[in-house]
């Protein structure tokens, strides 16, 4: 995925109302950016961090600029636009980068499924195999070399795991793909210390046939690619 036109830098002043952030550009202008991230954004939004933003040519948008990346004062690069995770996953699957998800000839998005009024992020289909349901989650919370999900309690995420377990029980493939969008993360673990129920359900899902994948993105201010598998550790420290 390439950024065209290129992203522009600014210094973060503050994030507020979840969806907004004030920044100051190198030439001294103060802008308000749209923040496409409803999470806690722990470690991704410290005042003084460098942010990189895109600009839309849609005149109907109230906020023309979108916060895409954070470059922290410690040197990490993070994609904070959670909407990019699905696009990166689709690109990686279509390009054959993820071997576990290769061999399908149809890719569909936002397909209704399950008994809890859900939509699957990605469905893969082929004539000679069962359907593959893929839920994509964006990982940006870093503590030491570990990346954690979620960064806040997520009843919606818990629902998705229940739905995936039902898919596996019905004989189709069920996959949860954690898209790691933080340059300092080398391993993935569920956030027991934030949402213990989600962590418990993830282990239960694994035991009931849900496949767990974690792939790390190569991030820059010009392009992003989901291209590196990393270890999944369901119970770190044990």
UniProtKB/Swiss-Prot annotation:
Transmembrane segments: none annotated. InterPro entries: SfsA, SfsA_C, SfsA_N. It holds the Pfam family SfsA_N. One of its GO terms (molecular function) is DNA binding. Disulfide bonds: none annotated. Belongs to the SfsA family. This is Sugar fermentation stimulation protein homolog. The lineage of its organism: Bacteria, Pseudomonadati, Pseudomonadota, Gammaproteobacteria, Enterobacterales.
